[in-house]
Each structure stands twice: as structure tokens, then as C-alpha cells.
Amino acid sequence: MTASARLDGRQLTGMPALHRECRREFGLPDFYGNNLSALIDCLSGVRDDDGMSRFVLAPGELLDIIVTDADLVRLQAPEVLAALEDVVEEVNLRHAEAGAAPALRLLLR
């Protein structure tokens, strides 16, 4: 099974925009800190039903993070794609360290 979240690449013009889009799409809490550490913390709990995002994954289920218009993001804000890659890597590392399957997959469209 796979759940999916779509980030609109036309809106991803820099890091503040990334945090706005992530807050909206992932359903992050009001106290979300608008930084990558906070994003990693929130998305690390996607299997815990901890209220840190709107997603609750079953064991072994993936959350596909789909970035639309990724070529545009690569041109206008490459740091956003690098940040998303780092977030996915760190969240999946946390899951691996806990003996769980990866939780996130980044898809550039």
C-alpha cells in the first residue's frame, strides 16, 4: 500500500515556501517550527498516529512525496529539492534504526 502527498513545484520558490506547502499538504501541527529538523520530527511519526501529520501509515506502507513541476524547482530553488532529499533520507534512517521499513519515497515529476 502507498499513500501519497503532492507538493506543487510551482509554489516551491524557496525554503519558506517549502515549509508552507509541507504544513498544508502533510497537515502539520500549528506549532510546527518551519525548519528541517521539525519537518523530520513530524514525518518520522507517520506510523505512530502521534498527530504530527495527517498521515498514519501501516507497517511496511510508504508515503510517496510527489513533487510536481520538479524541473522548475530544480531551476528556481534547487535547495528545496536537496532539503527534501535530506528529509526523506533522515526519516528513513530513523525507521531503519528502529528495525522498520522505509516510510517515505520522493518522486520528482
Regions found by a protein language model. Give the residues of each.
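Positively charged, polar, low-complexity stretches
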Residues: 1-109
